[in-house]
């Protein structure tokens, strides 16, 4: 009996060691980009980006554990920053809210506002957003956080819609409102996961954008929803588990507001079947039953193509930094060659690829208990400073060229060697 017990314990330990990936070592981020000057500006402000990222020793080398802990716990000893909630009534009669957090501490030379777009169904109350906001405030940045329509439990919807994967107008309304309040501020746009897609799409669409925008940062997005969903539909590596969680969260938001979203009038207008929505097992099923119908698309593929920033990024002229982790189980490694190639072929673009970090985790330090501030929080504050430095070095003529023309000088190809 003791031999059998020892064998069972040995098997369990082997499985745990494999899942936790504890034999892995800390690695330096790979840096892609051809614009040497732009990259050096970022690294000058944030030299630690050249150093190995050291996850929490016992579990931080597992992308699954990082992702799950991020979803369940968020951050260690999370602060609750105090901000002001702004409400806007949109032309479609929807109520859009965003929260503004002023910088704390001494006066700072530059007035910079970080405009944050959270992940799918997330808000200013999400734990990882609160931690990042507090850390940014302490470094002199004003923060504004978009609350996706329908995501806040205490805010009822007043129109006939909630947020969508590719609808950038809500983010644009927040930017416009911010500039009415702070007309001289410089803007750094930051997006997490789905928010990264929305920020990148907003900066790439053919639309008028304010000159106050000095750069953008995208974290852990998949770039192409068609490829991303095709990957998540596979059973290997717990992919369908993550897809089920995302589907259930999205459906819960719809059903929370079903008195409006699934009213008899809207069900008749869009051909909605409440039973199909309730029984949808995957996001493509739910998008077939609800999203593509209310947004007026013939197929789910058409909806995903319209929503994905990858199909717009050839128009991107704003300085941009992208961050992904190779062990991210949601924005998976096979999606990353696209952004590597993009960074290699465009100026004022930098791509950071980490071996570990999971989906929006990036916990660091300690043996079992992680540091309260993650590698990602530190990186985003540093990159924002680098974007400001790169912007301040440009002449007015160069600023105009950045917004209107694409340069073609090849400086670096492949991973940036530092």
Regions found by a protein language model. Give the residues of each.
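Alpha/beta-hydrolase-fold enzymes
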Residues: 12-43, 47-48, 180-295
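Alpha/beta-hydrolase active-site loop
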Residues: 161-182, 201
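Active-site machinery of serine-nucleophile hydrolases
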Residues: 133-150, 342-365
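N-terminal cap/lid segment of alpha/beta-hydrolase-fold proteins
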Residues: 56-109, 369
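Catalytic active-site module of serine/aspartate enzymes centered on a nucleophile-bearing elbow/loop
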Residues: 355-357, 361-418
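Short, surface-exposed "cap/lid" segments of acyl-processing enzymes
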Residues: 90, 101-157, 173, 177-180, ...
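Active-site nucleophile elbow and catalytic-triad environment of alpha/beta-hydrolase enzymes
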Residues: 289-312
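Short beta-strand/loop motif that positions the catalytic acidic residue
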Residues: 316, 322-324, 328
